[in-house]
Structures are given as structure tokens and as C-alpha cells.
């Protein structure tokens, strides 16, 4: 796993991607993550976990748009949430830190699959598990509306 230098700022560590998303997880098996990383190379994927990451996730660091935050702290979480444009609810197991509620409070859209959806409000966009390309299109359509 890449180790960030303590002398680098948060912006230096995440690079100059035009768009940012986050995934809070407690597993190394994030649903369709590799497909999404490939299909959305201009989106930085910030993946946060309260523990260390397993091999299935660490091996995806070959993609420059994947940034892993093992054993994250509240300050790191806040900095990531200040940077993201949307949230991907694609963690297939238990929700971490009631993150969908936090994302709704921030007024950001959430994209998820039927098998990973943790939101009970009906405010997010839910796709069938085999509709990865449709999710990519919806994300593209959304980020095209963001003014920079």
C-alpha cells in the first residue's frame, strides 16, 4: 500500500482529480469497484475503513484514482467529505458510521446497487446489481452538471 508522506498536504496526497467520491467500508470486497475505477478514471475514489485493508482491495491500488484510508480518524473523514461530489453506497455489508445519513445532510447524491443499498429514505439512485454501466452513465450525467 502506498504510504503518504507526513509532509504532504491532503490535496497533495489525493492528486488533481476533477471529481471525488467516497466509499466507507468494513470489507475488502467492494461491489464492482474495479469496473467503476476503470470506467470513471477522472473520479478519485476515497475508500475509508476503520481497520486495515485486505488483499482484494490493496491490489486495486494499481489504479491511480483509488486512495485508501486504513484506520481512518474523524479528521480524515471530515476532509474527505468536504471534497466529494457524490457518494457510492457499494459496500455489500453493514453500513459504516451511518454514512448515508451524513451524506443526505450534506445534500449530496448517493448511487448504490440493490445488493448494497443501505439508504431507507428512497433519496438515492439504486441500480440492479447487473446495471454497472447504467450507474456509470448516471454518475457521468451527474458530474456533467457540476460547475467548476
Per-range role (PLM):
Residues 65-67, 124-125:
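Short, conserved active-site loop motifs that form the nucleotide-linked donor/cofactor pocket
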Residues 50-51, 66-80, 94-96:
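Conserved active-site histidine-acidic residue motif and adjacent donor-binding/catalytic loop
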Residues 61-64, 82:
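Structured loop/turn residues at beta-strand edges in well-structured enzyme cores
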Residues 24-27, 68-71, 94, 129-133:
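Conserved phosphate-coordination/catalytic loops
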Residues 3-62, 71-74:
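Conserved catalytic-core segment of nucleotide-activated headgroup transferases in glycan assembly
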Residues 36, 80, 102:
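Hydrophobic/aromatic ligand-binding patch that stacks against planar heteroaromatic rings
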Residues 85-147:
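Catalytic binding pocket for nucleotide-activated donors in carbohydrate/polymer assembly enzymes
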Residues 43, 64-66, 108:
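A structural micro-motif
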Amino acid at each position: 500500500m502506498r504510504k503518504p508522506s507526513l509532509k504532504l498536504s491532503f490535496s497533495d496526497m489525493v492528486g488533481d482529480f476533477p471529481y471525488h467520491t467516497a466509499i466507507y467500508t468494513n470489507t475488502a470486497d467492494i461491489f464492482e469497484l474495479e469496473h467503476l475505477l476503470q470506467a470513471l478514471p477522472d473520479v478519485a475514489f476515497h475508500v475509508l475503513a476503520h481497520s486495515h485493508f485486505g488483499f482484494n482491495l490493496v491490489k486495486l491500488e494499481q489504479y491511480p484514482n483509488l486512495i485508501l484510508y486504513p484506520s481512518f480518524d474523524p479528521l480524515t473523514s471530515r476532509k474527505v467529505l468536504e471534497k466529494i461530489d457524490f457518494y457510492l453506497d457499494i459496500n455489500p455489508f453493514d453500513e459504516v458510521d451511518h454514512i448515508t445519513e451524513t451524506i443526505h445532510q450534506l445534500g449530496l447524491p448517493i448511487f448504490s446497487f440493490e445488493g448494497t443499498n443501505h439508504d431507507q429514505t428512497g433519496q438515492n439512485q439504486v441500480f440492479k446489481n447487473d446495471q454497472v454501466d447504467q450507474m456509470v452513465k448516471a454518475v457521468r450525467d451527474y458530474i456533467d452538471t457540476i460547475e467548476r
